[in-house]
């Protein structure tokens, strides 16, 4: 399926003042209610990564799970889940980070990756880059490396992609929104 940025953007709802005043939340749930838009999104990522040399896909809690698991299935790659604190049942590594909303912790099972593994990390969007930087730190602490950070949406004005690139992590997104774009 051919990528159509207009179709993609038309399936992303802008929700002003959520979860707090001044924030425009990018709601991707309409994207998952449109089989055509979802197929186009997954197919676009699959086409980009089908011949890429990485061993695992990482997915960020919670909306990153949606796209990361679909791409992992399509590419036949193991899926590593990065969860919010207290959600994983076995031994974990944890990493603190700042989000656009405040402070939080990210965890991953301690046996999820091995030295030499290479991880493509998915999230729904790149805002400040805090969660993806925390995931990258966890990947490295487990002896693996980050192949790339991928997202459906980039919010470049918040600087996350730049922060990731400054940390040596390449990024890819299907579309970008200005903060005031509706």
UniProtKB/Swiss-Prot annotation:
It is an enzyme of class 2 (transferase). Its EC number is 2.4.2.7. Pathway: Purine metabolism; AMP biosynthesis via salvage pathway; AMP from adenine: step 1/1. It holds the Pfam family Pribosyltran. Transmembrane segments: none annotated. Its main location: cytoplasm. It catalyses: AMP + diphosphate = 5-phospho-alpha-D-ribose 1-diphosphate + adenine. Gene3D superfamilies: 3.40.50.2020. It is found in: Cytoplasm. PROSITE patterns: PUR_PYR_PR_TRANSFER (PS00103). One of its GO terms (biological process) is purine ribonucleoside salvage. Keywords: Cytoplasm, Glycosyltransferase, Purine salvage, Transferase. GO terms for cellular component: cytosol. Coiled coil: none annotated. GO terms for molecular function: adenine phosphoribosyltransferase activity. The keyword Cytoplasm applies. Catalyzes a salvage reaction resulting in the formation of AMP, that is energically less costly than de novo synthesis. Belongs to the purine/pyrimidine phosphoribosyltransferase family. Homodimer. This is Adenine phosphoribosyltransferase. It comes from Pseudomonas aeruginosa (strain ATCC 15692 / DSM 22644 / CIP 104116 / JCM 14847 / LMG 12228 / 1C / PRS 101 / PAO1). The lineage of its organism: Bacteria, Pseudomonadati, Pseudomonadota, Gammaproteobacteria, Pseudomonadales. The gene is apt.
């Amino acid at each position: 399926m051919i990528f159509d940025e207009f179709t993609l953007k038309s399936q992303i709802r802008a929700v002003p003042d959520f979860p707090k005043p001044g924030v425009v939340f990018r709601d991707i749930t309409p994207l998952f209610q449109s089989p055509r838009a979802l197929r186009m999104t997954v197919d676009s990522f699959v086409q980009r990564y089908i011949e890429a040399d990485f061993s695992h896909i990482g997915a960020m809690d919670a909306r990153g799970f949606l796209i990361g698991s679909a791409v992992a299935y399509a590419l036949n790659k193991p899926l590593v889940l990065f969860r919010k604190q207290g959600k994983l049942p076995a031994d974990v590594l944890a990493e603190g980070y700042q989000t656009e909303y405040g402070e939080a912790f990210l965890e991953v099972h301690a046996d999820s990756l091995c030295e030499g593994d290479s991880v493509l990390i998915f999230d729904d969007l790149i805002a400040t880059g805090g969660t993806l930087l925390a995931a990258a730190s966890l990947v490295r602490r487990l002896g693996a490396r980050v192949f790339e950070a991928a997202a459906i949406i980039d919010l470049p004005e918040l600087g996350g992609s730049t922060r990731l690139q400054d940390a040596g992590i390449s990024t890819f997104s299907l579309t970008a929104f200005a903060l005031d774009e509706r």
